[in-house]
Amino acid sequence: MKPVLTGANMRPNDVDRLMQAARVSDPLDLVSPYQFNHALAPHIAATRDGVPIDIQHIKIAFDTLHARHDVLLVEGIGGIMVPITKDFFVLDLIALLGLSALVVTRGDIGTINHSIMTVKLLQSHEVPVAGLVLNYQNTTQAHPPEDLGWPEILRSTEVDSRGVLPHISNLEEAWDEGMEYLSQRLITDDLFPVH
């Protein structure tokens, strides 16, 4: 599930990839109840399009999908302090849905501050943190994890590493290979226990 998709007109978009990876064919309006073409924060995109976001509508879609599947992965929308509505943030949605968080950090300078603040804020709101992933999404591995402070991040947050994802320059062509890589390195039985 991706509760709000911005940049919906880009192909493939996050929801396309999410549904392909999960191998599901649930209705699009359940997987992503709100979709906006503007690649902006949800509240800003919704305001620009004149479409108010109803958090209860997202909750109903979540509950419906949760009842259909043994495991439900909910992809975030930017960082945890990105506004979904004027006064309701991604962090609030995580707490409302009773989710654990897998924090994916960027493989670049500044990740110490960003990662520790994100984890500490989640913890202060009693959101369980299932692990940290260092992702070299937009860059080659110019700085090794040690130079980015990866060990310090793990020590300071007391959260387990779930892996380091290398930059893949030909992601479109290597999608299946990348999914295999992820399934072998990130997903473990203890990551998201089934309740």
Feature-to-residue mapping (PLM):
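N-terminal phosphate/diphosphate-binding loop that engages ATP/GTP or pyrophosphate donors
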Residues: 1-52, 56, 63
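C-terminal lobe/tail of nucleotide-utilizing enzymes
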Residues: 120-195
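Short internal beta-strands
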Residues: 2, 102-105, 130-136
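Inter-motif core of Ras-like GTPase G domains
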Residues: 85-108
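P-loop NTP-binding module
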Residues: 63-76, 98-101, 183-190, 195
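Phosphate-binding/switch loop-helix module in NTP-utilizing enzymes
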Residues: 42-84, 91
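A general structural detector for well-ordered alpha-helical segments in enzyme core domains, enriched
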Residues: 14, 58-61, 90-93, 118, ...
